[in-house]
Amino acid sequence: MSKRYAVILAAGQGTRMKSSLYKVLHPVCGKPMVQHVIDQLSRLDLTNLITVVGHGAEKVKSHVGDKS
């Protein structure tokens, strides 16, 4: 069986959104945007899920936790 990986690009300030909340943490249908991606990827048989964070990394990491 081959190893399958997924990478979530969750870096960016979201300055064009005119908000102090980091882009990937903006709620869509009651969940942060990044959570929708994690939920979909968790349905796959992945070896590893990697999340790339940048600006606001601590807040994104605290939401993502050990899911990625």
UniProtKB/Swiss-Prot annotation:
Pathway: Nucleotide-sugar biosynthesis; UDP-N-acetyl-alpha-D-glucosamine biosynthesis; N-acetyl-alpha-D-glucosamine 1-phosphate from alpha-D-glucosamine 6-phosphate (route II): step 2/2; Nucleotide-sugar biosynthesis; UDP-N-acetyl-alpha-D-glucosamine biosynthesis; UDP-N-acetyl-alpha-D-glucosamine from N-acetyl-alpha-D-glucosamine 1-phosphate: step 1/1; Bacterial outer membrane biogenesis; LPS lipid A biosynthesis. Its cofactor is Mg(2+). GO terms for biological process: cell wall organization; lipid A biosynthetic process; peptidoglycan biosynthetic process; regulation of cell shape; UDP-N-acetylglucosamine biosynthetic process. The keyword Transferase applies. It catalyses: alpha-D-glucosamine 1-phosphate + acetyl-CoA = N-acetyl-alpha-D-glucosamine 1-phosphate + CoA + H(+); N-acetyl-alpha-D-glucosamine 1-phosphate + UTP + H(+) = UDP-N-acetyl-alpha-D-glucosamine + diphosphate. Keywords: Acyltransferase, Cell shape, Cell wall biogenesis/degradation, Cytoplasm, Magnesium, Metal-binding, Multifunctional enzyme, Nucleotidyltransferase, Peptidoglycan synthesis, Repeat, Transferase. Binds 1 Mg(2+) ion per subunit. It is found in: Cytoplasm. Its main location: cytoplasm. One of its GO terms (molecular function) is metal ion binding. Catalyzes the last two sequential reactions in the de novo biosynthetic pathway for UDP-N-acetylglucosamine (UDP-GlcNAc). The C-terminal domain catalyzes the transfer of acetyl group from acetyl coenzyme A to glucosamine-1-phosphate (GlcN-1-P) to produce N-acetylglucosamine-1-phosphate (GlcNAc-1-P), which is converted into UDP-GlcNAc by the transfer of uridine 5-monophosphate (from uridine 5-triphosphate), a reaction catalyzed by the N-terminal domain. Homotrimer. This is Bifunctional protein GlmU.
